[in-house]
């Protein structure tokens, strides 16, 4: 069964790159959610005036991977204890958030946060927000890492996250990688 998940954990280039490598994830689209204006641009979101988070919306086959496993990857590939910040990326657009699509996703998110919270030095600050609307990012942000692998941000920030995914979740990787 095809289901949707909408997750924010810093720069959407990172998040798209991670989840596009996970078996059972059918598609990953970078974009914006959680804000107050319609069809925001990257520039508007980055200046912090819209309230949107950079996020991804993915479609996944729930017969191959479940929402809990997606959240395991989510929490293992960013720091959910830093408020509105991931590394050098600072602002509400880089917050950690789960935009849940139904009550089951909410319950799963609450359960995994309760399980993982003791594993960090600081409390998890990931927001749980009912999903409302998702706006696709501009095309130049789609598949950014794969199209720009030698760009300094990709090498310094995204590549280490990919390595962490490979070492911590090898069994979840798509075979073609």
Task: List the model feature ranges, each with a label.
Residues 1-177:
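Flexible coil/turn and secondary-structure edge motifs
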